[in-house]
C-alpha cells in the first residue's frame, strides 16, 4: 500500500492538509518551506559531523549537542515526504498504517528532543554549580548511560499507545489539519471511545514533558542562585553566556509544542489554518534555528565548521589538481 497518493479519498485513508484555504498558493508556499527543510538538513548534518570528526569536541556538552542535532535531523526526515508531497504534488492521502508509523516517530523524536534538552540542562548545572567535579560526574560512560536512557524512554511510553491505537477502527476520508499525523487529531476519528486514548496521550504529555520542563526550570533556579553568588561580574556574565544557547533551544521547542497541544485539546474552535501553521512551526522551528544558534554563539563549533569546510574545499582542490596532472 502506498504511503500517500493523490487519488480520491477512501475509507482506509486520512487526508493531509498543508494550509487550509491556501491551496492555490501551495507552489509558492513550498519555496520557503523547502528552503527551511534544506537549512535544517544541512545545518544539523554539519553540527553532527563536526562533533563526531573533531576530537577536541569529544566532551559531554558537545556529545549532548550532537544528540540534539541527530534528533532534529530525524524529526525533519520523518515529516519531509508528506509535507512536500502535499505542497508539490497534492498527494494528500495517507494510509492508516503509514499514518500510525509516522505519528509514532513524530512523537518519539519529540520526546527524544525533550529528553536531550533535560540532559543538556543537567550538563550546564554540573558545569556551573559543581565545576571541580564536572569531569568525574559526566564521564564518557555516564554520557553513554544517559544516551541509552534517552533512547529507551520513548519506546517504553509510546509503544503501548501505538498498540492501543492499532486495535481500534477509524473513520476514513477525514481531513487532518496538518501535513503529518498528530495524535490528538487522529484519535478524534475512532469508532470506539476516543477519550481513552486521548486521555492517555494527554497524561503522557503532561507527565513526560511536564516533568522535563520542571527539571529544566529547577536546574536553572540552582544555576541562577550559583551565578548570583559569584562576586566578579565578568565571571557572572561568562557563566550565564554558556546557558544562552540552551535557553533558546528550550524556548523554541516547548512554546510551539505547548501551543499546538492547547489548540487541539482545549480550544476546539481554533481555525484550521492556525493549527496547520502551528504544526509547521512546531516541526521546523527547532531543527532550523538550533544549528544557527549554536554555530553563532559557540565559538568552538563555529571554528570547527569553518575548518571542516576548508578541509573539504582543499581536498576537492587537490583532487582537481591531481586530475589535471593525469588528464
Swiss-Prot record:
<keyword id="KW-1003">Cell membrane</keyword>
<feature type="transmembrane region" description="Helical; Name=7">
    <location>
        <begin position="276"/>
        <end position="296"/>
    </location>
</feature>
<feature type="topological domain" description="Cytoplasmic">
    <location>
        <begin position="297"/>
        <end position="327"/>
    </location>
</feature>
<keyword id="KW-0472">Membrane</keyword>
<protein>
    <recommendedName>
        <fullName>Olfactory receptor 51T1</fullName>
    </recommendedName>
</protein>
<dbReference type="InterPro" id="IPR000725">
    <property type="entry name" value="Olfact_rcpt"/>
</dbReference>
<feature type="transmembrane region" description="Helical; Name=2">
    <location>
        <begin position="57"/>
        <end position="77"/>
    </location>
</feature>
<keyword id="KW-0812">Transmembrane</keyword>
<dbReference type="GO" id="GO:0005886">
    <property type="term" value="C:plasma membrane"/>
</dbReference>
<feature type="transmembrane region" description="Helical; Name=6">
    <location>
        <begin position="240"/>
        <end position="260"/>
    </location>
</feature>
<keyword id="KW-0552">Olfaction</keyword>
<keyword id="KW-0675">Receptor</keyword>
<feature type="topological domain" description="Cytoplasmic">
    <location>
        <begin position="220"/>
        <end position="239"/>
    </location>
</feature>
<feature type="transmembrane region" description="Helical; Name=1">
    <location>
        <begin position="28"/>
        <end position="48"/>
    </location>
</feature>
<comment type="function">
    <text>Odorant receptor.</text>
</comment>
<keyword id="KW-0297">G-protein coupled receptor</keyword>
<feature type="topological domain" description="Cytoplasmic">
    <location>
        <begin position="123"/>
        <end position="141"/>
    </location>
</feature>
<feature type="glycosylation site" description="N-linked (GlcNAc...) asparagine">
    <location>
        <position position="6"/>
    </location>
</feature>
<feature type="topological domain" description="Extracellular">
    <location>
        <begin position="163"/>
        <end position="198"/>
    </location>
</feature>
<feature type="transmembrane region" description="Helical; Name=5">
    <location>
        <begin position="199"/>
        <end position="219"/>
    </location>
</feature>
<feature type="topological domain" description="Extracellular">
    <location>
        <begin position="261"/>
        <end position="275"/>
    </location>
</feature>
<keyword id="KW-0325">Glycoprotein</keyword>
<feature type="topological domain" description="Extracellular">
    <location>
        <begin position="78"/>
        <end position="101"/>
    </location>
</feature>
<feature type="topological domain" description="Extracellular">
    <location>
        <begin position="1"/>
        <end position="27"/>
    </location>
</feature>
<keyword id="KW-1133">Transmembrane helix</keyword>
<dbReference type="Pfam" id="PF13853">
    <property type="entry name" value="7tm_4"/>
</dbReference>
<keyword id="KW-0807">Transducer</keyword>
<feature type="glycosylation site" description="N-linked (GlcNAc...) asparagine">
    <location>
        <position position="5"/>
    </location>
</feature>
<dbReference type="InterPro" id="IPR017452">
    <property type="entry name" value="GPCR_Rhodpsn_7TM"/>
</dbReference>
<dbReference type="InterPro" id="IPR050402">
    <property type="entry name" value="OR51/52/56-like"/>
</dbReference>
<keyword id="KW-0716">Sensory transduction</keyword>
<comment type="similarity">
    <text>Belongs to the G-protein coupled receptor 1 family.</text>
</comment>
<feature type="transmembrane region" description="Helical; Name=4">
    <location>
        <begin position="142"/>
        <end position="162"/>
    </location>
</feature>
<feature type="topological domain" description="Cytoplasmic">
    <location>
        <begin position="49"/>
        <end position="56"/>
    </location>
</feature>
<dbReference type="InterPro" id="IPR000276">
    <property type="entry name" value="GPCR_Rhodpsn"/>
</dbReference>
<feature type="transmembrane region" description="Helical; Name=3">
    <location>
        <begin position="102"/>
        <end position="122"/>
    </location>
</feature>
<dbReference type="GO" id="GO:0004930">
    <property type="term" value="F:G protein-coupled receptor activity"/>
</dbReference>
<dbReference type="GO" id="GO:0004984">
    <property type="term" value="F:olfactory receptor activity"/>
</dbReference>
Amino acid at each position: 500500500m502506498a504511503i500517500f497518493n493523490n487519488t480520491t479519498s477512501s475509507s482506509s485513508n486520512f487526508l493531509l492538509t498543508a494550509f487550509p484555504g491556501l491551496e492555490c498558493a501551495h507552489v509558492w508556499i513550498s519555496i520557503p518551506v523547502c528552503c527551511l527543510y534544506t537549512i535544517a538538513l544541512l545545518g544539523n548534518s554539519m553540527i553532527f559531523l563536526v562533533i563526531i570528526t573533531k576530537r577536541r569536541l569529544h566532551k559531554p556538552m558537545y556529545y549532548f549537542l550532537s544528540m540534539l542535532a541527530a534528533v532534529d535531523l530525524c524529526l525533519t526526515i520523518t515529516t519531509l515526504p508528506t509535507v512536500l508531497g502535499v505542497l508539490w504534488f497534492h498527494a494528500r492521502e495517507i494510509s492508516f498504517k503509514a499514518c500510525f508509523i509516522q505519528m509514532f516517530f513524530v512523537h518519539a523524536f519529540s520526546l527524544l528532543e525533550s529528553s536531550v534538552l533535560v540532559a543538556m540542562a543537567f550538563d550546564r548545572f554540573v558545569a556551573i554549580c559543581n565545576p571541580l567535579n564536572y569531569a568525574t560526574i559526566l564521564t564518557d560512560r555516564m554520557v553513554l548511560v544517559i544516551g541509552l536512557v534517552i533512547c529507551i524512554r520513548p519506546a517504553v511510553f509510546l509503544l503501548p499507545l501505538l498498540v492501543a491505537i492499532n486495535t481500534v477502527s477509524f473513520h476514513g476520508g477525514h481531513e487532518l489539519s496538518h501535513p503529518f499525523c498528530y495524535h490528538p487529531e487522529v484519535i478524534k476519528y475512532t469508532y470506539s471511545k476516543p477519550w481513552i486514548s486521548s486521555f492517555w496521550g494527554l497524561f503522557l504529555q503532561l507527565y513526560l514533558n511536564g516533568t522535563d520542563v520542571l527539571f529544566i526550570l529547577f536546574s536553572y533556579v540552582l544555576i541562577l542562585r550559583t551565578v548570583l553568588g559569584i562576586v566578579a561580574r565578568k565571571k557572572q556574565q561568562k557563566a550565564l553566556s554558556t546557558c544562552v544557547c540552551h535557553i533558546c533551544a528550550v524556548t523554541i521547542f516547548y512554546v510551539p509544542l505547548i501551543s499546538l497541544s492547547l489548540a487541539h485539546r482545549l480550544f476546539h474552535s481554533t481555525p484550521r489554518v492556525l493549527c496547520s501553521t502551528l504544526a509547521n512551526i512546531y516541526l521546523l522551528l527547532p531543527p532550523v534555528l538550533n544549528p544557527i544558534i549554536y554555530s553563532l554563539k559557540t565559538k568552538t563549533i563555529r571554528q570547527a565548521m569553518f575548518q571542516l569546510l576548508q578541509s573539504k574545499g582543499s581536498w576537492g582542490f587537490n583532487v582537481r589538481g591531481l586530475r589535471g596532472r593525469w588528464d
